[in-house]
Amino acid sequence: MAKIKARDLRGKKKEELLKQLDDLKVELSQLRVAKVTGGAASKLSKIRVVRKSIARVLTVINQTQKENLRKFYKGKKYKPLDLRPKKTRAMRRRLNKHEENLKTKKQQRKERLYPVRKYAIKA
């Protein structure tokens, strides 16, 4: 089997990807048997290509699955932890923009009664 490109895999359905994954795993097991029995050098070098192809197929499956989950949870109040933006612990606990701008009644009254003085300078 030739080297598989990820862009070719992205257009396929999940069933096709799973079938291709099974085929690649079967091929890998056959190549490993050939390695033990003393197979040709071409078969031995093919093991690496097949392993990388399996990784590509699994990557595409996982990425599409995560993308679908993102679409499903878009606009919902709660999201799974792995779909939330990755930030530091301190950044997650920080006040949001709205909470930072809130003022107490006392503070609002003080600002209203004693506004900032503006001075005009005579040239």
Curated annotation (Swiss-Prot):
Its main location: cytoplasm. Residues 85-113 are annotated as: Disordered. It comes from the Eukaryota. It holds the Pfam family Ribosomal_L29. Residues 86-96 have a biased composition (Basic residues). GO terms for biological process: maturation of LSU-rRNA from tricistronic rRNA transcript (SSU-rRNA, 5.8S rRNA, LSU-rRNA); translation. GO terms for molecular function: mRNA binding; structural constituent of ribosome. Keywords: Cytoplasm, Ribonucleoprotein, Ribosomal protein. GO terms for cellular component: cytosolic large ribosomal subunit. PROSITE patterns: RIBOSOMAL_L29 (PS00579). It is found in: Cytoplasm. Belongs to the universal ribosomal protein uL29 family. Component of the large ribosomal subunit. The ribosome is a large ribonucleoprotein complex responsible for the synthesis of proteins in the cell. Component of the large ribosomal subunit. This is Large ribosomal subunit protein uL29. It comes from Gallus gallus (Chicken). The gene is RPL35.
